[in-house]
């Protein structure tokens, strides 16, 4: 089902991309947009994980430098019945994390330096389990495709500001000043709405499955509360420069959108915590626990 959802998303985003191209350049613009969209679809499927990791300056963690952290992730992956993902570190003080990759065999989990410093090992395990749930559900390709297309659509809409008011080679005037302004506002908004719909619907499921993987819903609940509070106060510069990837993080990393419920990329954190607390109250815990170091060498 993951590939089916991704295929539908690619079709929707491609149609939106073509529409923007047609409004900017008429028939020629639509043809160019179609070619660009086809290339983007290929690139996104095979290389979008590398692109997103590069956007955030993530570097792969050497198992010898953080053996306990690697052992924790490997143990959680085994409990989830999936391959060990590649592990990346993002050098920012804001605690956060995301997962990416086209399938469980080609996946990566990225955590921030701030996450490893601010959270307890149990809370880190809860966060990693949440990201593994996204990988297991094949949400990662879906979210990465959305981020890539949303960024491209926003960029294309900005081109309309410079080229949308004139005539194209066929003498057509696809959009005037009013149309250009509408395009600049509505195209990124439409892409953003797709992002929000996908992210909100998948976060609750990843919370539920992540809690089952780590065996302790309250570990993740505690982590979410702590990340939410710190993320409001600590900047994530690379995330602010790449807002199209905000929906990939476990908590929205953007300050501008953190208080906007209408355009939130994530469900309300208090509601997520309440759902996890309800799971714990219902006894949804595992008797066997993952190996969690008392004090990781990454701090």
UniProtKB/Swiss-Prot annotation:
Cofactor: Zn(2+)
Keyword Metal-binding: yes
Annotated compartments: Cell inner membrane
Cofactor note: Binds 1 zinc ion per subunit.
Keyword terms: Cell inner membrane, Cell membrane, Hydrolase, Membrane, Metal-binding, Metalloprotease, Protease, Transmembrane, Transmembrane helix, Zinc
Transmembrane segments: 7-24, 29-46, 145-165, 174-194
Positions annotated as active site in the UniProt record: 131
Enzyme Commission numbers on file: 3.4.24.-
InterPro entries: HtpX_protease, Pept_M48_protease_HtpX, Peptidase_M48
GO cellular component, one term: plasma membrane
Membrane topology field: Multi-pass membrane protein
Residues reported in the UniProt entry to bind Zn(2+): 130, 134, 203
BP GO annotations: proteolysis
Gene Ontology MF annotations: metalloendopeptidase activity; zinc ion binding
Listed Pfam families: Peptidase_M48
Family membership: Belongs to the peptidase M48B family.
HAMAP family documented for this protein: Pept_M48_protease_HtpX (MF_00188)
Matches recorded under NCBIfam families: PRK01345.1, PRK03001.1
Protein name as catalogued: Protease HtpX homolog
Source species of the chain: Cereibacter sphaeroides (strain ATCC 17025 / ATH 2.4.3)
Gene behind this protein: htpX
